[in-house]
Amino acid sequence: MRVSRSLTIKQMAMVAAVVLVFVFIFCTVLLFHLVQQNRYNTATQLESIARSVREPLSSAILKGDIPEAEAILASIKPAGVVSRADVVLPNQFQALRKSFIPERPVPVMVTRLFELPVQISLGVYSLERPANPQPIAYLVLQADSFRMYKFVMSTLSTLVTIYLLLSLILTVAISWCINRLILHPLRNIARELNAIPAKELVGHQLALPRLHQDDEIGMLVRSYNLNQQLLQRHYEEQNENAMRFPVSDLPNKALLMEMLEQVVARKQTTALMIITCETLRDTAGVLKEAQREILLLTLVEKLKSVLSPRMILAQISGYDFAVIANGVQEPWHAITLGQQVLTIMSERLPIERIQLRPHCSIGVAMFYGDLTAEQLYSRAISAAFTARHKGKNQIQFFDPQQMEAAQKRLTEESDILNALENHQFAIWLQPQVEMTSGKLVSAEVLLRIQQPDGSWDLPDGLIDRIECCGLMVTVGHWVLEESCRLLAAWQERGIMLPLSVNLSALQLMHPNMVADMLELLTRYRIQPGTLILEVTESRRIDDPHAAVAILRPLRNAGVRVALDDFGMGYAGLRQLQHMKSLPIDVLKIDKMFVEGLPGDSSMIAAIIMLAQSLNLQMIAEGVETEAQRDWLAKAGVGIAQGFLFARPLPIEIFEESYLEEK
């Protein structure tokens, strides 16, 4: 931005002028003060010199010895100060004169301003003074005026030089401060105002400068922002009618596009749904206008009832609606919402003795930050057109792959929930034994699902699919409750065998985890020390401190805590400090480290040493050979589980094999 007259130059000139006036006055006052001080010092020196010769001069004058008096005057040491010495009689007759320094011209103005030359007059008395002595003569000493003139000029030049430099520094410093504290913020404000796009002029808000919260610039910015807010409110009131659909008062297409522009600017993943209600179109000319309005408003209320507060509902035509589904991150979220919309919209609707069953078509376009508002809208319209041609109550994505992925995701979720409901999930137990004696000390609970052929297994990726479907907390709670139910049944029979249950990070960090777990312990009356929760270390725990806050009350309630799959993730070297803070009792060594035994033992030896230093009980997983068992037993690991001892077993077989005697 260019200006014709710089405020910086003007304020520097003003500051410089003020400073120069100040310097002139100050230099003048100081110069007169210094000259007066020098005059006083010179007069003192002259008086001292005069007193040193007054007595001998008095004796010579009384004796009338003129040569001796002249010799005494000649003996005065001028010291560069005295220019002339005179002996003047009381009748003003000049008896003697002695010049030491030739008189040099001094400007008359300097002589008048500073009262030059400086001279003193000292009375000369007889050696024997009467009661009221009268001087017999006066010794008059005169200072060198030229020397005083040089002092005046030297002092003046020094003062002017120093204070001009100070004035320059002061001018620059003050100007810099004014420039930084006033001009820079004003320039920034001017640049920001000039850079505002035309479409953002109304309602634009200036950022309040950090150092100007409560001064005039801050007041200016606040006043501007307040005026902009008032203008924006007035502008919105004027344009509200033009941005709303008449009957439903929903945002129309113009306002929808503005909202989509904001969504695109934020680059936040969302979905745009176009809902075409064919019933509204088909009733044109059949229902009265008032009836069609009632139908429209009823459908709008139904739509609002299934949308979350974050979502935006708009009406883009007489029978088309649009939903900006904020919060929808995945296609399956969108298809779930679409199914809810279809369900509620297709409910039977009586309109003044006419029974209607509305039907709709829904088109969905996902936004991942790579489209413009127009492209996103066009995709959703295209998907809605395709859905309408497929038949009634159809949902169609613009991208067929998204449709397929969403349907697959919903199918998986439905399959898992159906498996839970139809008792197709079961818990199996794998013994954990003392390696030296083979004695059973505890068992680990493992999840199994019934296969189509009737067998039970844990398919690869099932746990990951459960997590992706958001059902880990549901399935995990089922496993915990089944385990507590089994423990309660055992304990009624006097069997106090501990059970270890895996706990995922999603379960651990769930807000209701502690309350739900304590409720299970109370309901099934689980004895302290018989339930062990295995925190799976390879599943990332985002906040170790929160994990401590969750595990500690459970441990206080009698639940033991084990760290599962040790060495596979969470307790890496840079996280050991967090591991030390966890309230854990047992450390489980992952089978990946056990597989290499006895040949590759360096890592597992370090893990064993760490566990021993923390005084933790150790359990080795995946022990399959006698060589592995022997090495682990020799290294100090007392408990193990693996195919060498037993495979996972159904509860009935486990009880027959291990609990019959008990």
UniProtKB/Swiss-Prot annotation:
The record, for Pfam families, names:
EAL (PF00563), GAPES3 (PF17154), GGDEF (PF00990)
Instruction: Name the reaction it catalyses.
Output: 3',3'-c-di-GMP + H2O = 5'-phosphoguanylyl(3'->5')guanosine + H(+)
Q: Where in the cell is it found?
A: Cell membrane
**Recorded superkingdom:** Bacteria
Give the UniProt record's GO annotations in the biological process aspect: regulation of single-species biofilm formation; signal transduction
Q: Which InterPro entries match?
A: Cyclic-di-GMP_PDE-like, EAL_dom, EAL_sf, GAPES3, GGDEF_dom, HAMP_dom, Nucleotide_cyclase, Rev_trsase/Diguanyl_cyclase
A single Gene Ontology MF term assigned here is: cyclic-guanylate-specific phosphodiesterase activity
Q: PROSITE patterns annotated for this entry?
A: EAL, GGDEF, HAMP
> Might you give the EC number(s) for this enzyme?
3.1.4.52
Does the keyword section mention rRNA-binding? no
Q: How does it sit in the membrane?
A: Multi-pass membrane protein
Classification via Gene3D superfamilies: 3.30.70.270, 6.10.340.10, EAL domain
Transmembrane helix: is it a keyword of this entry? yes
Annotated ranges, domain HAMP: 180-236
GGDEF domain location is 268-400
Main localization of the protein described in the UniProt heading = membrane
Q: Where are the transmembrane segments?
A: 12-32, 158-178
Q: Which keywords label this protein?
A: c-di-GMP, Cell membrane, Hydrolase, Membrane, Transmembrane, Transmembrane helix
- The chain positions of domain EAL read 409-662
Matching entries from PANTHER family are given as: CYCLIC DI-GMP PHOSPHODIESTERASE PDEF, CYCLIC DI-GMP PHOSPHODIESTERASE PDEK-RELATED
Q: What does this protein do?
A: Phosphodiesterase (PDE) that catalyzes the hydrolysis of cyclic-di-GMP (c-di-GMP) to 5'-pGpG.
**Name of the protein:** Probable cyclic di-GMP phosphodiesterase PdeK
